[in-house]
C-alpha cells in the first residue's frame, strides 16, 4: 500500500511530496514474502555490484566502512511531487552512502539536484546513483513536470 513519503523517518510533509512502499518492512514483507525475497535478492545484487565499483574508485584510503543496507523503499512521484533539500543522515540514523535506483525515464522533471541545482546527473532507467549521505551532500528531487517517476532507495551503514 502506498503511504506518504517521509524524510529521515520524520513525517514532514512540506519537505517531501511523494508516496512510498516500504519493501523491507512489516506487512509488505509478510504479505508478499516469496516475491519480496526474489526482489530483495536482485536489488541486493545490483546495489552490491555497483557499490564494489564505487568503493574501488572512491575509497582508496579505506575511509568508507560499510556493513549493511537499511532495506528498500519504492518511491512514486506523480506530477508536482518533489523532495526539498535535505541530507540523508542524522544524529540518530547513521548512514554512510545513499543509493537511488531509477526504474523509469518516461517522465519530465524529477531530477536529483546537488549543489543548489549546479549538479543534476542525467539518469536513465536502470541507473544507480550512489553518493555520500553526509552533510556535505545536501540534495533534492525537483518537481515532476509530467508523468510518474519511480525509484527504489536504500542507505548503506
What feature does the model see in each segment?
Residues 72-74, 99-101, 152-154:
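A structural signal for short, well-ordered beta-strand segments
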Residues 88-105:
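Short beta-strand/loop turn elements enriched in aromatics
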Residues 1-64:
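Non-heme Fe(II)/2-oxoglutarate
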Residues 59, 86-87, 137-139:
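Eukaryotic intrinsically disordered and solvent-exposed regulatory patches
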Residues 74-91:
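Conserved short histidine dyad/triad with adjacent acidic residue
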Residues 80, 95, 106-157:
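Catalytic core of Fe(II)/2-oxoglutarate
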Residues 61-76:
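Acidic, glycine-rich loop-and-strand cores that form catalytic or ligand-binding grooves
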